[in-house]
């Protein structure tokens, strides 16, 4: 009977440890489940990102997608002004690179680029006006995407624009997730 008593004691001990761990909030949490926005933030300003690349309309596309993503993520107003806001997201587009990564042979024996990678690097700062320390900052936030050019050379600009649009959306999602992960 001593074996049964030992098993009951061990089972009781294991149950007590599990119950204690569950009720004490062991400190584990799911990645990507940050608390979202600081409750004191009701209005966020996102001025037009500065563009050091010269890529036409890139600043407008990136800024617009960041605003849309912030609106999707919380119960805050988002405006393009820095007046009368509780927090500001400022960005500077540092680099925009299109690099051929896939090639195909033409009918004349020539090789042409058929797939491109786009890499975007942006300096971003998320802060409350008047505070010295930002709530979140990244001096080289990068995102990379690829797009196929297709076989029709006439569609190059359409495909390139679609690639930039897709990159802007994915970049904004990734950026806002990283910013809110800190909370």
Please place each PLM-identified region on the residue numbering:
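Surface-exposed short loop/turn segments
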Residues: 73-77, 83-136, 144-157, 162
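Bacterial N-terminal signal peptides that target proteins for export
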Residues: 2-13
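Bacterial N-terminal signal peptides
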Residues: 12-23
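C-terminal partner/receptor-binding element of secreted or periplasmic proteins
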Residues: 161-176
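A structural "domain/chain start" motif
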Residues: 2, 24-75, 79-83, 98, ...
